[in-house]
Amino acid sequence: MTPSADDSSPGRARRWPGLLALPLVVLAWAVLVVAPVWIQAAHACFAHFDLGIYVQALARMSLADPNPWLSARQVYIFNDHFDPILVLARPLVVVLPPMWAALVGEALFALLAVAPLLWLQARGLLSRAATGLLAAFLLLSPSAVEALKFPIHPTTWSALPWVMAGVAWHLRRNGWLLVSLVLLFACKEEFAFAGIMLTVALWLRGERRFAVGVGVLSLVWLAGVYGLRPWLLGPSEDYSLRLKQGMDGGLLHYLALRLAPVHLSRVGTLVLLLLPLGVWAWRERVKPDWAWLLVLLPMLGIRFLGMAWRFHYGVPLLAAALMGFLPLLRGRKVPAWVLVSSGLIILFSNELNLRQFTRTLTSSRTYPRQCPGDPSRLDSIARGVEVIARHREGPALLGSNFVSLLADRDDIYAVGGPQPDDGRVYEWVLVEKPPHGEVYPLTYERVTALIDLWRADAGTEVLIDDANVFLARGRFTAHR
């Protein structure tokens, strides 16, 4: 008689960790990261930069107006960053309010970065444990967590095309690689520089005809963004100023700013995350794919010179670096010590983030301090937002954290934010009262003074003036 398989058998028991790895990672991400961010969004916790910018872009983008004017940012969306990947998230606005369309879109892009790895697993090229480990890096690393904690930015979305490109590179799927590059370039203009380095990598690998094609695509994209775009769309935001910051103090001062401990600690965290994989590769005598790792050079240079390692800036760097370990992970069983040590590093490097998010889950009525989920506060905000949304005529001056809630309304501006040069007179004012609300770059004292100034005007019609919100109609000029 043939014995039947038993769930308690040692072989079956050893398979359970591999089977559960990816579901547990996704569950932890959904509960400990996505849910707290969405709770905070529902409580109006996030400033106009960057959530309000991209929510207003999605709300106003259409076939008739593909490059909408963002009144609160005082720029056309593609004259700021060139990130046409936004078009893929635009259909969500049909079924969801703009702010939720943006948040759901960002979460979907982050989660879909795991899909190419699942495809490798289905083909028998990655073990379940390896897939779960890479997913943990992509979804739960400090860079990924802080990117979602600072919504929204298409740089975060670039994890998906970076993983697609890495898989296509290692499998020599040139068609897939080309599609991945187009999606990657559409996330932010800087990624076309990585295309130049990928051209070099392909040339070194002997794929010279395809290398020429990738090089042409990259150069055409760069020429379009930095040459044709200003000619067609008008002046673009000059982000090169960040790269030059500190040059007036001399070379030593310039380098000292970029080598400050706050920046080096971020680099150290990225290196530490990859240390177990690096040690394992050394023990297995698997050489890094130096050709692929060339794509990291432009991003490293831009982040070093621009002192930009936090939030969404680390996501593409980590995603691209992880793809350099595919030759190591392909067809190999990941040692337990790599899984455990990597998991512990992810956990402890996220200690502050997880503590904050756990407080949001367990004490959302009182935390975060500047935007508690107190029912009376939320009711005041809802009443104020409803009035401004119903009266769509006249410029409205809003607290920074209200821009995303009213993104589909014309003529909205943020207190303390960019303003028109024409000395705009605002018909509506809606702000939170300190100590609540997002007031940067102002102070709570200045916002209190502005409320007193607006209230004292003889022509002001005060509509809400409770403990939480100030809403008034009149003629207002002071905005900072």
Please describe what each predicted stretch is.
Residues P23-L27, G215-L219, R330-T358:
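Signature aromatic-anchored transmembrane alpha helix within multi-pass, membrane-resident enzymes
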Residues M1-A35, W119, R128-T131:
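Start-transfer (signal-anchor) and selected internal transmembrane alpha helices
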Residues R266-L293, L297-L300:
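Hydrophobic, aromatic-rich transmembrane alpha-helices
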Residues E146-T155:
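Short acidic/glycine- and proline-prone juxtamembrane loop motifs at membrane-interface regions
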